[in-house]
Amino acid sequence: MTSAPIAQQRLLIDLQDIDSRLARLRHERKHLPVLGRIESVIERLKTNKRAAIQADAALSEAKTRVTRSEDEVGQVVRRAEALRERLHSGNSAARDLSAIQGEIDQLGQRQSALEEAQIAAMEALDSAREESERLKQEESDIRVAGRELTAKRDAEFARLDQEIDSLEKQRADLAGTVETALLSDYEAVRASTGGLGAVALRGRTVEGGAVEISPQELARIVAAPQDQVIHAEENDVIIVRMDI
């Protein structure tokens, strides 16, 4: 059973206060609201990237369709011009003139259909370009928002890290004044409970943690020697008497 002067035991309450504050600060650092917002920005950027890949593919396909439609129209126009030259050259036999004119008429119909398809392809190209540009602008906006949030996160980290560093130094100084055996006892309890090592007992009231003591246990504590380090029956937390 560990024993230590009551003054030494009371240092554990100050140490616990620092440890509790450190735990709160570390929890705050890990769960800053800005971190969730940054994650949302990252997801938006991923979604934008996927959409941009699809948009670029659609733009490339639209360009190919426009080029193909232009080539098809050009071929029909050149063929029709060649036939008109034959028709008006006077070198064709009379029996061929009707066939030439018929093919010219068919090419005219074909040209009209191809030109309509060309217009549709150009409209699709314009839409694909607009979507690609929209996604590029969206990406830029997302990155701007990301940089702003990152700057805010870094500022919050710097503030919290400064507080944590200051408290860690205070803790090191204070821990250095606690007897080795008592400090080891405290640290072991903290490790087993997940952070709570010591609580203060003032009269019949336990302060600083969820520790309940029965009347029988209270009587045992009151009767214990002053330098005896007392552990709660419930969870082994060190109970420091503040009124003796």
Region annotations inferred by a language model:
Residues 1-5, 20-60, 86, 133-147:
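Short, charge-rich amphipathic alpha-helices with coiled-coil/heptad character
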Residues 39-46, 70, 97-105, 124-125, ...:
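Short, charged, amphipathic alpha-helical segments
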Residues 49, 72-112:
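Extended, amphipathic alpha-helical coiled-coil scaffold segments used for oligomerization/tethering
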Residues 54-66, 107-128, 174-175:
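Amphipathic alpha-helical coiled-coil segments
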Residues 68-80, 114-139, 184:
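Long amphipathic alpha-helical coiled-coil segments
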Residues 125-160, 241-244:
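Non-transmembrane, heptad-repeat alpha-helical coiled-coil rod segments
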Residues 146-208:
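Coiled-coil termination/hinge junctions
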Residues 206-209, 231-235:
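Short cysteine-rich clusters marking metal-coordination/redox-active sites
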